[in-house]
Amino acid sequence: MPESSRDKGNAAISGNRSVLSIASPTKLNILSSDWSRNQGKVSKNSLKRSSSLNIRNSKRPSLQASANSIYSRPKITIGAPPLIRRDSSFFKDEFDAKKDKATFSAYSSRSYPTIGSESVVSQTSLSQPTTSREVDEQFTVAADRYIPILQGASQNKVDPETLHEALPPPNASPISHLRAQTKIVFKQNVAEACGLDMNKRILQYMPEPPKCSSLRQKSYIMKKRTHYSYQQEQKIPDLIKLRKINTNPERILDAPGFQDDFYLNLLSWSKKNVLAIALDTALYLWNATTGDVSLLTDFENTTICSVTWSDDDCHISIGKEDGNTEIWDVETMSLIRTMRSGLGVRIGSLSWLDTLIATGSRSGEIQINDVRIKQHIVSTWAEHTGEVCGLSYKSDGLQLASGGNDNTVMIWDTRTSLPQFSKKTHTAAVKALSWCPYSPNILASGGGQTDKHIHFWNSITGARVGSINTGSQVSSLHWGQSHTSTNGGMMNKEIVATGGNPENAISVYNYETKFKVAEVVHAHEARICCSQLSPDGTTLATVGGDENLKFYKIFDPRCTGRSREDGLMDGMLGLIGKEGCRTNDKENRSKNSSEIHTRRPSSTSQYLIR
């Protein structure tokens, strides 16, 4: 195809497609996508008669049809031959010979124990064809007593750790996860009903030692108990309840020119409900409240590799392919500053912390930039050997999590600029990183195509506290919550993962049980590259290689789960004077809010230098 006609075709396609326009929910914008037009065609040729096809030894005269005529094969009128069963006489002689040969070789190679000088099994019995059951009976009768042989220690006790091995296979439906957990809870309930301890052996050959008094036992347990052993004491988990989520997207927007690259972060959603998306060399802003679309900038010759909103939601940082990072003011739609890394490679990941911005490059360096000073690079960390494709600051700013193409997760101490922990558990690139909002010390990381796992880390001890096998590539992770009416309206901690092949699904897991509670199968035609959670924490925006931006309602609105103890405390406070406590809380909140606002700059010119 000549280049001129190809350019005209591309121009025609781009002319018919408007950026971030509402696509039809029924057609899912299949015809307008280049990927679907090239990969989604299914061509089926009808069976035609060729000149080389001749029917011989037929009673009918030869067919002299043209090459373009459709040929239909005649049906076979002769009945199919009868099938030969395996137990028929045809296989009987051969089967008996093999059986006798195997029995003789097994008996000749087996040696039996003896008592004194007499053999337990006589040689005459070995010469006769006997079965294994007869041999076992002779051995039992000749021996003086029967001693059971324990094949393993785990055979005679119920180990809670082995119960997790009964998890369903990856990519299993939420119903399969519910059935697996039902079996686990059933085993635990049976053990409790029978009066058996989960770590107690069933067969015991010695009597139990005398028990001490209850007071002495409690004091001993309190002395030996530590924080970690106390955390490991788990109650019988309640059965998970499958959640019903809408598998159809609430809105579909067209995103022509989106880069199908797993290592890039091209989507960001601000707290002011403005979604920023990078389409090739241009950056667009979509207001989720009004639906307005605006073009912020178009670099024409430079590709955008990462996009992230600042903490004040008034500025946005753009990582480019040439190694530079630009900061734009959204209100004035103008460029504020350009920060040059000097590396000459693309900036694929960004993370803000007040006036500091961390940039991850393709060469493996992490640069900490201070936007208030002229020499913006204040620190450079070069511990990764591959591209840094994931960065995320902790809420308190004391730690920074990074994931790279070297299959490594690192947790950095921002005060010493040194990595506290370096984890190489993943077997693929780590892009998805997310800090837990309920337990700030818990970090979730997701691996790529060959890893397919989600690992949970304790950022204080560096220990891995849980894992989930998703069965697909993990491109993003987001924490959410749901509320159940069966458990008194308590909050369920959940995490949503977006993936790629084979199902391009959105999966929701319960953090406590690690079971899948909901999923959206085939959410996109291609793999999901990026996703962002809305400011209210309910809607998930996903974009994939099919050049479609979709919005799914996943979580319930964010609110703090109240327990029964909180209700009792509120009642007690009401007796001693609830109004006084409320006034004190309001004063403390006003002081904290004033301190927070005083720390942030009031205008752009105070901390941004051109």
UniProtKB/Swiss-Prot annotation:
Which regions are annotated as WD repeats? 257-296, 299-338, 342-379, 383-422, 425-467, 469-519, 523-562
Instruction: Spell out the Basic and acidic residues composition-biased ranges.
Output: 579-598
Residues spanned by motif KEN box: 586-592
Q: Does the keyword Phosphoprotein apply?
A: yes
Outcome of substituting residue 209 to Q? Confers spindle checkpoint resistance and diminishes binding to MAD2 and MAD3
Q: Position of motif C-box?
A: 144-150
One Pfam family in the UniProt entry: WD40_CDC20-Fz
Comp. bias regions, Low complexity: 43-56
Question: From which residue to which does any coiled coil extend?
Answer: none
Q: Polar residues: which segments have biased composition?
A: 599-610
> In chain numbering, where does the motif D-box fall?
17-25
Q: Which UniProt keywords apply?
A: Cell cycle, Cell division, Mitosis, Nucleus, Phosphoprotein, Repeat, Ubl conjugation, WD repeat
Tell me the InterPro entries matching this sequence: Cdc20/Fizzy, Quinoprotein_ADH-like_sf, WD40/YVTN_repeat-like_dom_sf, WD40_CDC20-Fz, WD40_repeat_CS, WD40_rpt
Please indicate if the UniProt record lists Transferase as a keyword: no
Q: Where is this motif: Bipartite nuclear localization signal?
A: 85-101
Region annotation Disordered: where it falls in the sequence = 38-59, 579-610
What's a single GO CC term here? cytoplasm
Q: Where in the cell is it found?
A: Nucleus
Q: What does the protein in this record do? A: Activator protein that regulates the ubiquitin ligase activity and substrate specificity of the anaphase promoting complex/cyclosome (APC/C). At the metaphase-to-anaphase transition, recognizes and binds proteins containing a D-box including the B-type cyclins CLB2 and CLB5, HSL1 and securin PDS1, and recruits them in a C-box-dependent manner to the APC/C for ubiquitination and subsequent proteolysis. Required for sister chromatid separation and disassembly of the mitotic spindle.
Q: Which family does it belong to?
A: Belongs to the WD repeat CDC20/Fizzy family.
Q: How does it assemble?
A: Component of the mitotic checkpoint complex (MCC) which consists of MAD2, MAD3, BUB3 and CDC20, and of the MAD2-CDC20 subcomplex, both of which appear to be assembled during mitoisis independently of the kinetochore. In mitose-arrested cells, MAD2-CDC20 occurs in a larger amount than MCC. MCC associates with the with the APC/C complex. Interacts with MAD2, MAD3, BUB3, HSL1 and PDS1.
Q: Which PANTHER family match?
A: CELL DIVISION CYCLE 20 CDC20 FIZZY -RELATED, FI02843P
Q: What is this protein called?
A: APC/C activator protein CDC20
The species is Saccharomyces cerevisiae (strain ATCC 204508 / S288c)
Q: Which gene encodes it?
A: CDC20
